[in-house]
Amino acid sequence: MPPKEAQASQKLFGTDGVRGKANVYPMTAEVAMQLGRALAFLIRNGPHRHRVIVGKDTRLSGYMLEQALASGLTSMGVDVELVGPLPTPGISNITTSMRADAGAVISASHNPYEDNGIKFFWRDGFKLPDETEGKIEELVSSGSIDSIRPTATKIGRAFRMEDARGRYIVFLKATFPRELTLEGMTIVVDCANGAAYKTAPAVLEELGAKVIALGVSPDGKNINHKCGALYPENLAKTVVKHGAHLGIALDGDADRLIVVDEKGKVVDGDAIMAICTGELVARKQLKKKMLVSTVMSNIGLERAVARWGVKVARTRVGDRYVVDEMRRNGYNLGGEQSGHLIFLDHTTTGDGTLAALQLLAVMCRAGKPLSELASIFEPVPQTLVNVVVKQKKELGELPTVMKVIKSVEQRLGNTGRVLVRFSGTEPKARVLIEGEDAARNQAYAKEIADALSKALSV
């Protein structure tokens, strides 16, 4: 663990909780315990016993962090319900249904097994706002609650919840229209050897589908390894080989969804949003004729939904910011190109399995193959390049990079756009070029990526 002065200058929370290499600061047992104590301090009010739901994905380091987080919570007099491996949205759902004070997820989502993370949900099932995360960070760094030590009967207890998985499966099935069935459909589902390895196949089978399951043999080290939402190639091959109706790809914590049509073509979050927007408009269920996406979404999404008189509100990257925009303005559909899809009429956060069920409902009602439904979305060519960096700075502090960006913007004119941003969860900068000429996009992206590499290599 770095010295206290280094820790003080290092922000714990990113765009999706605290994340890093397992057993390396800040993803250590010590920090996990401190996070638990800080969360417990914030929720302690009134004479009643307080409870926090704690779940995880299938990473090896989850055992270590689960115990440390639970120790921190119980040491402050808060009870803990340990649900074991369960999708992130499942933990959010259990938190609200159990009327718990908060929920905690131990996961690094789509990252490799060497990483891990901790993120929190409030009692209403929504992720903590930035201000609350800031309070937790201040409590951890200041040491101001170190002396608070409940004793004897005031110490919290930890329990194992044995039926959490079943509760979540029942919830998911209830979001699928009762009059519909998946009988006669063959569905390939890739669970990324992650948190949904038992829930997603079960839901689809119980609704009547013939299921071919991939990525359902987690060993603690193979989560997201050449499988799941980031690696749909094997899924696509399996769909075509078995003549399946579609393929469903989830990531390690199952909060995102990418699908593959019956021809093996990938259908991303933008296309899924376009399809579901059309369905909600037709059923007069899309609130205020608005869809929420992020700056990463393709301009083709706006063009696709414009035919129904729907407008798109864009936010910064991160499903939490999509949800914030939806709640603030009373919208009920939003998501990200990466596959975080939020159906606010059903849930409070991105849920890959739930989103798949909503898409399947559209397919059942339309009686059309996914490839035909997805044809309403025509993306403008995009190039996305990830640049590994050793440090992150404001782009305005990088004159050589800004010069290249402005040059590219001038050459693109009004025929495309440039987006350069730092990842909130990884040591990477992301360069997105959108324009009608794919080859030109690649060349422009490389120019900017090279400039970033030179400027941030030390």
Swiss-Prot record:
Its cofactor is Mg(2+). GO terms for biological process: carbohydrate metabolic process; peptidoglycan biosynthetic process; UDP-N-acetylglucosamine biosynthetic process. SUPFAM superfamilies: Phosphoglucomutase, C-terminal domain, Phosphoglucomutase, first 3 domains. It is an enzyme of class 5 (isomerase). It comes from the Bacteria. One of its GO terms (molecular function) is phosphomannomutase activity. It catalyses: alpha-D-glucosamine 1-phosphate = D-glucosamine 6-phosphate. The active site is at 109 (phosphoserine intermediate). Mg(2+) binds at residues 109, 251, 253, 255. CDD domains: GlmM. The modification Phosphoserine is found at residue 109. Keywords: Isomerase, Magnesium, Metal-binding, Phosphoprotein. One of its GO terms (cellular component) is cytosol. Binds 1 Mg(2+) ion per subunit. Activated by phosphorylation. Its EC number is 5.4.2.10. Belongs to the phosphohexose mutase family. Catalyzes the conversion of glucosamine-6-phosphate to glucosamine-1-phosphate. This is Phosphoglucosamine mutase.
